[in-house]
């Protein structure tokens, strides 16, 4: 990447190509407490099993969350319209999924927010939120509130709080997700009857969801 950057800089200097910097202004839309009951929160698809459970945890804390469907080529093509193709592939998919959902007409832009994780470190995942901000603005959705999930206080929103109940249920969701992922992917290639592993997984997924809803630790430990 550094070699590519140096080559581009040398080419620009050789051909005397200079571009005036374009100032990008951005007003941060707020996600307020009142929006909890009125807004649908869109989340990009990153881990199908885990996010299905996290959706349940969010619901029990009063947030109406919708997880985007599995990624396909159309989401990638949509993302490339608003994100430079030299960013990491998950960022392209993430922006594409969200913009595609907003353009679908299934969600009212005035009653829709977006949630995304943010690492807050040196990883590019820290920049997913700014990329999404720019992508939504370019796509014609500058007023969509963005909620950042992180542990260092970046981009706080007054209407999204980490309550003890939410954190407990989220932790249960992640542990259940890891467990399901390990046992399902380990056994599915060797199933005797095609589809039987998925059927068993779906049964226990519903049991796990019920446990996340009631937050019963005795049931969880058993």
Model-predicted regions and their roles:
Residues 1-222:
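An N-terminal assembly and electron-transfer interface module characteristic of large anaerobic redox
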């Amino acid at each position: 990447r550094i070699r590519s950057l140096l080559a581009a800089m040398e080419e620009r200097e050789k051909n005397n190509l200079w571009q005036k910097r374009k100032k990008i202004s951005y007003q941060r839309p707020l996600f307020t407490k009142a929006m909890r009951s009125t807004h649908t929160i869109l989340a990009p698809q990153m881990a199908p099993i885990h996010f299905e459970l996290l959706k349940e945890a969010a619901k029990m804390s009063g947030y109406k969350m919708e997880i985007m469907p599995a990624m396909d080529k159309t989401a990638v093509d949509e993302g490339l319209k608003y994100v430079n193709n030299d960013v990491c592939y998950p960022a392209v998919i993430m922006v594409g999924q969200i913009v595609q959902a907003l353009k679908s007409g299934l969600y009212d832009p005035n009653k829709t927010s977006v949630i995304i994780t943010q690492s807050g470190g040196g990883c590019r995942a820290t920049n997913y939120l700014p990329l999404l901000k720019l992508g939504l603005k370019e796509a014609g959705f500058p007023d969509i509130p963005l909620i950042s999930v992180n542990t260092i206080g970046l981009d706080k929103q007054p209407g999204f709080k980490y309550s003890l109940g939410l954190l407990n249920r989220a932790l249960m969701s992640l542990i259940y997700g890891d467990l399901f992922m390990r046992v399902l992917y380990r056994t599915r290639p060797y199933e005797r009857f095609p589809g039987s592993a998925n059927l068993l997984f779906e049964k226990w997924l519903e049991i796990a969801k019920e446990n996340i809803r009631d937050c019963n630790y005795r049931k969880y430990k058993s």
